[in-house]
Regions:
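Individual alpha-helical transmembrane segments in multi-pass integral membrane proteins
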Residues: 1-9, 22-108, 132-141, 192-207
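Juxtamembrane membrane-water interface segments that cap and precede transmembrane helices
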Residues: 117-131
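Alpha-helical transmembrane segments
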Residues: 10-14, 146-149, 208-217
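Juxtamembrane "helix-exit" motif on the non-cytosolic side of transmembrane helices
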Residues: 44-53, 109-120, 181-190
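Interfacial "cap-and-anchor" motif at the non-cytosolic start of specific transmembrane alpha-helices
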Residues: 167-219
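Alpha-helical transmembrane segments of multi-pass integral membrane proteins
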Residues: 15-42, 93-96, 129-186
Length: 219
């Protein structure tokens, strides 16, 4: 299921970029999809890599994609979608949205504050308590920001079609937040593998729903 989720995530990134003219909204969503696909791929890698190899390559994907690419992509997507492109790429916004995940991922790569515990049918990625203080706000905080940002923007919309469209995107983002927290925040550390794998596919379904809703009549 993880391999299927990875393939679909990659395809969604390609699909969004291939429909109509490219813009930074599409690029940021594609970044999120590809990073999410690589993040999901860590489970599949555990099958073919040794523990020593996984501690290097698997953890690297977790840091770079799960703690950097995913939150940056999804936060930029919501910001660009709701505030427009021209006033988004300034020093203030980039420093708030991009720098914290990058710093967090850099800390992970340099200090590698994680331990990989192997169990019969999978793996559990356990972060040291001090690192969770960075990990949880960065990964899930940026997802909550994305859903909340779209929700706040909806209050000022008067066009029914646009409200419906933005509402669908908000619901998709909210679904990703809830599913991600259960599948990656709770199940991963508890060793609930079926929930983890089901969460991979459910997140991809929400990604597809957002892509479809965003691209509807926008090409």
């Amino acid at each position: 299921m993880s391999i299927l989720g990875t393939i679909v995530s990659f395809y969604l990134g390609y699909y969004v970029l291939s429909r109509g003219e490219k813009n930074w909204i599409k690029i940021s969503f594609a970044l999120y999809c590809v990073s999410g696909g690589l993040f999901i791929l860590t489970r599949a890698l555990r099958i073919v890599l040794t523990v020593e190899q996984y501690e290097i390559y698997g953890a690297t994907l977790v840091y770079l994609c799960g703690m950097c690419g995913v939150p940056v992509g999804i936060a930029l997507f919501s910001r660009l979608l709701t505030h427009g492109e021209e006033d988004t790429f300034n020093t203030k916004i980039l420093s708030v949205i991009v720098v914290p995940p990058v710093v967090c991922a850099f800390i992970g790569l340099v200090f590698n504050p994680s331990e990989v515990i192997t169990i019969e049918i999978g793996h559990v990625q356990v972060f040291e308590p001090w690192f969770q203080v960075l990990y949880v706000p960065i990964l899930f905080g940026w997802m909550i920001y994305a859903a909340g940002n779209v929700g706040i923007m909806m209050r000022d919309l008067t066009d029914d079609y646009l409200r419906k469209k933005m509402g669908g995107i908000r619901n998709g983002l909210t679904g990703i937040v809830v599913t991600g927290f259960i599948a990656y925040g709770v199940a991963t550390n508890m060793g609930w593998y079926n929930i983890m794998f089901a969460g991979d596919l459910l997140v991809v379904m929400f990604q597809a729903y957002i892509a479809y809703t965003y691209l509807e009549e926008s090409v």
